[in-house]
């Protein structure tokens, strides 16, 4: 079965992101296909590489990166939602601030539009929102 996961919750103020990560890992471990994880609205904050949880908390940004690296899961972030929340990549930042070549988008995530999400909707058997 093909799954797409939609994450709309921020990394730490709700349970959405943690539940989405655990569900995504379970999908893979149960031999289903996880086509992509799409971060939208406050979910875009999951891609901020500068998030620094307490030492006794799970680092969700690193967990998402682990999932991407180990299973090649696509971590798609809505570009509009990300920019609205201050999550930017180097390319977007360079366009706006010519002299600053820094971004806070974690390298395992990539910015994309809702068109990409709609393409995954067409080929997924299930879309799960967190």
Curated annotation (Swiss-Prot):
List the signal peptide residues.
none
Record keyword Cytoplasm present: yes
Known Pfam families for this protein?
A: DsrE
Q: List membrane-spanning regions.
A: none
- What InterPro entries does this protein map onto? DsrEFH-like, Sulphur_relay_DsrE/F-like, Sulphur_relay_TusD/DsrE
Q: What's the domain of life for this entry?
A: Bacteria
Can you tell me which residues form the catalytic site? 78
User: Which keywords does this Swiss-Prot/TrEMBL entry list?
Assistant: Cytoplasm, Transferase, tRNA processing
Q: Which Gene3D superfamilies match?
A: DsrEFH-like (3.40.1260.10)
- Main location as per UniProt: cytoplasm
One biological process term in Gene Ontology: tRNA wobble position uridine thiolation
The cellular location(s) given in this protein's UniProt record come to: Cytoplasm
Per UniProt, the enzyme's principal EC class comes to transferase
* CC terms in the record's Gene Ontology section: sulfurtransferase complex
MF term (GO), any: sulfurtransferase activity
Its Enzyme Commission number?
2.8.1.-
| Role summary | Part of a sulfur-relay system required for 2-thiolation of 5-methylaminomethyl-2-thiouridine (mnm(5)s(2)U) at tRNA wobble positions. Accepts sulfur from TusA and transfers it in turn to TusE.
Report quaternary structure and partners. Heterohexamer, formed by a dimer of trimers. The hexameric TusBCD complex contains 2 copies each of TusB, TusC and TusD. The TusBCD complex interacts with TusE.
What family is this? Belongs to the DsrE/TusD family.
Q: What is this protein called?
A: Sulfurtransferase TusD
Q: What is the lineage of its organism?
A: Bacteria, Pseudomonadati, Pseudomonadota, Gammaproteobacteria, Enterobacterales
Gene transcribed to yield this protein:
tusD
